Amino acid sequence: MSEMTPREIVSELDGYIVGQHNAKRAVAIALRNRWRRMQLDEALRHEVTPKNILMIGPTGVGKTEIARRLAKLANAPFIKVEATKFTEVGYVGKEVDSIIRDLTDAAVKMVRLQSIEQNRFRAEELAEERVLDVLIPPAKNNWGQPEESGEPSSARQNFRKKLREGQLDEKEIEINLAAAPMGVEIMAPPGMEEMTNQLQSMFKNLAGQKQKPRKIKIKEAMKLLVEEEAAKLVNPEELKEKAIEAVEQHGIVFIDEIDKICKRDEVSGLDVSREGVQRDLLPLVEGCTVSTKHGMVKTDHILFIASGAFQVSSPSDLIPELQGRLPIRVELEALTTEDFERILTEPSASLTTQYIALMATEGVSITFTEDGIKRIAEAAWQVNECTENIGARRLHTVLERLMEDISYDASEWNGKTISIDADYVHGHLDELVSDEDLSRFIL
């Protein structure tokens, strides 16, 4: 669980997302409250429930990006789902309980990686011994079993030194490695994924773990052996217990496109499952117990963050019970020309930085001038206003169109410097931007 303060979390998010300070503050406080709750006495800790968040804002302003970055900062079980993928029980589609099952699977994977990392030093020692056993087989007694000697031989110690110094990395050896289990593909109807997973696990267990001889270089063998030995040191039952505890105490679920499951008054019949999805979500958000293949998981203290554009609906179109379980509301502002300029320059992996790096691989030096960036931002904003407002995603379309000629002829521009200034942008984009019909279909 991350111990970063809200201010540190916001500062970290600022490196990737421009503006939207209120949304960043809300998720930062919610994440910090997870840590604060764990410092309380157990009796009071159980009573403190997470304050779920509803993020409201037009498409392309950073709602999903905040979730992606939060997942990396949280160091906790995290899953992002699309509300449109789910239907109520009885309809074709995934049931909402699969959210918690997927979250638990993610937690098991996360805890397993942490356990392997903790056991890495011991695993490296065991892997080293297995490689040395191949290079210098131990002496055997009359019954064909390895003799137990107190001190390793000088030859073994010499090879150990060479192995650690990397002198034997390119030497090939034949060693027994765990064979990958035979995959069993099972075609199941939508909504039956859990049964499919259980059947695949059953077949995998029936097959057992087999050893297969492979001839590979020592450097690669060490990597594979370390992973194999580290996996053996992990206790599966203890791993499941830790994963379930991590989900129950620190789990975060991000539900995107929640506005798409709002019931619309003018639509009936085909719209019937929308409200059903909301009602199925209620127990999860309020707190219930979900059965997973790893065990029973309580959702009482899982943090839910929902987001939606709400362009053809409003948050009040959600059923009242679900509205009440999303008490913190954050509105994200539409992006301005100034925001577009900042998006093109401020983030650590901004679009301009990406294009400069991509063209550098062909030996082409690209520079973006201030007036060029300003004109790109104005063009993106203008197209958004005239056609459909898709927020910052419009910059991808505009820049790709702008860089098309350079990308196509990059090999011929090797060793040259190209400056993307206002005149260059005018020449390549003005005709498209000024013609609304062309903008609609090309940009």
UniProtKB/Swiss-Prot annotation:
Region of interest (Disordered), ranges: 139-160
GO molecular function: ATP binding; ATP hydrolysis activity; peptidase activity; proteasome-activating activity
Pfam short name (any one): AAA_2
Keywords in alphabetical order: ATP-binding, Chaperone, Cytoplasm, Nucleotide-binding, Stress response
Places the protein is found: Cytoplasm
CDD domains: RecA-like_HslU
Gene3D superfamilies from the UniProt entry: 1.10.8.60, DNA helicase RuvA subunit, C-terminal domain, P-loop containing nucleotide triphosphate hydrolases
Residue positions binding ATP: V18, G60, V61, G62, K63, T64, E65, D256, E321, R393
SUPFAM superfamilies: P-loop containing nucleoside triphosphate hydrolases (SSF52540)
One CC-aspect GO term: HslUV protease complex
GO biological process: protein unfolding; proteolysis involved in protein catabolic process
Quaternary structure annotation from Swiss-Prot or TrEMBL: A double ring-shaped homohexamer of HslV is capped on each side by a ring-shaped HslU homohexamer. The assembly of the HslU/HslV complex is dependent on binding of ATP.
HAMAP family registered for this protein in UniProt: HslU
Function noted in UniProt: ATPase subunit of a proteasome-like degradation complex; this subunit has chaperone activity. The binding of ATP and its subsequent hydrolysis by HslU are essential for unfolding of protein substrates subsequently hydrolyzed by HslV. HslU recognizes the N-terminal part of its protein substrates and unfolds these before they are guided to HslV for hydrolysis.
Family: Belongs to the ClpX chaperone family. HslU subfamily.
NCBIfam families: hslU, PRK05201.1
Protein name in UniProt: ATP-dependent protease ATPase subunit HslU
